[in-house]
Amino acid sequence: MTLLYTKEQKALIKLIHDVAEQELKPYVAEADRAGECPAELYEFGFDLGLHLVEVPKEYGGTGLDYETTAMIFEELAKVDAGYAITFVTTFVALRNVILAGTPEQAQYFADVVKQRQFAAFALTEPNAGSDVASLRSTAVETEEGYLLNASKTFITNGGLAQIYIVFC
């Protein structure tokens, strides 16, 4: 499939490519050895507005379309896929709240993201994999909130996140 890029998209791709090569690439090998990305690189991404790319305009984000968003993170992933996935996972989690939550929940979630925070995505379970129909986790409403009983694996962004989407 051939994509026809607009002038704006071409300029944005070049900008992201140049920034990734100059600012991100020098840290990739050390981040791989250390097993984590330096906090200042995430701050750099926040300064670029990467955390707002797929947040809808009505919630205070850029509201970029999916194609442009994909182009941005594809370009970043060419240098460091893990770095790109850290931001993308936040959008995947937010998208679930926008589609299945209330407008108030979506606004709350977007407000967390706008404060330079990451989200985690907890779907996979030891006996179910990512088969949603086979999940055993439960969330039961109590007087104090919710009681979550879950066993999850592969919680994407689990070590960085301030807000979690947990599938039950």
Where do the PLM segments sit?
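A structural signal for short hydrophobic beta-strand segments in well-ordered beta-sheet cores
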Residues: 137-140
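A short core secondary-structure module
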Residues: 149-168
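N-terminal glycine-rich flavin-associated loop
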Residues: 81-103, 129-132
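Short glycine/proline-enriched turns and hinge-like loops at secondary-structure junctions
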Residues: 64, 131-133, 157-162
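Amphipathic, small/basic residue-rich leader segments at the start of a protein or domain
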Residues: 1-87, 107-108
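A short, Trp-centered hydrophobic/proline-enriched beta-strand micro-motif
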Residues: 115-123
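Short beta-strand segments that buttress and anchor functional surface loops
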Residues: 122-125, 166-168
